[in-house]
Amino acid sequence: LKGEKALYFESRATTQFACQYDSRFSYCAYIPENYDENKSDRYSLAVIVHGSMRNAQQYRDAFIDFAEETNTIILAPLFPGGITEPWESDSYKFVRVKDVQFDQVLLAMVDEISKRYRVASDRFLLHGFSGGGQFVHRFFYLHPDRLMGVSIGAPGNITDLDTSAPWYVGVGDYEEKFGVSLPLAQMRRVPVYMVVGGDDLETWMINDKDAPFWKSGLEKAGNTRVERLRTLRDSFEREGISVRYEEIPGLGHEGFQVLPAVKAFFQTLLPPR
């Protein structure tokens, strides 16, 4: 150990650490109380991706109970606004924008935390809601081999598995854009959960055709987040990707209220303690 002061900031609810791969980005973590530097057992990893409000630490804190119950380390990345241009707030949702590869930033964070703690980082759990839901399903398209399971919560815009539409409306030019073919066989092996509030029906934000990242064709997925997540589910199932799908009655666009259902899904994927 590097001393009590260092250990204090690196245990349980950690401080915010700059990502060494690219210090414009940072992350915090939660390390279960029973973690012992002198033991050899490895902990599972769950990555929780914030939405547009960037409340990464709040999401980390909301998973403390899950971490303690399941011996899971929680990683909560922070993708600040204004990265690709001043005042923009959406670029991370689309995974790769201009010269920024947000998926590689996240993988670098996973690598960094795996060097500090005994964590099974080769495959991890991934959840995101709203803007985070946009990021995680597109990350899934790029790196299914790294995922133990993915939870997609109420994304405002979706990337349909439609080969007739260009990225990020569809995946028609996926190979041209990313240099590899869409890894459908690997995607079929990853457990997928989709969740949205049954009353998540506001449309003003997700149908703004003047928004910087709007593309013609996004509207074809539906008018509301509920309709769009149903479209994404149907898209997955047409390609043989099994989906556990849930609309929570009476719930609007409330990311913290879906977490009990997300945790229940994650628990089905972890080995019993």
Where are the predicted features?
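Short beta-to-alpha linker loops that shape the active-site pocket of alpha/beta-hydrolase fold enzymes
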Residues: 78-82, 156, 251
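A domain-start/cap signature at the N-terminus of enzymes
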Residues: 1-45, 58, 127-129, 134, ...
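Conserved hydrolase catalytic core segment
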Residues: 138-148
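Serine-hydrolase catalytic machinery in alpha/beta-hydrolase-like enzymes
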Residues: 23-25, 41-122
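The feature captures the conserved acid-bearing segment of alpha/beta-hydrolase catalytic domains
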Residues: 149, 154-239
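Phosphate/oxyanion-binding active-site loops and adjacent basic polyanion-contact surfaces
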Residues: 22-23, 98-106, 165, 224-225, ...
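C-terminal catalytic histidine-bearing segment of alpha/beta-hydrolase fold enzymes
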Residues: 226-273
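Alpha/beta-hydrolase
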Residues: 43, 47-49, 153, 196, ...
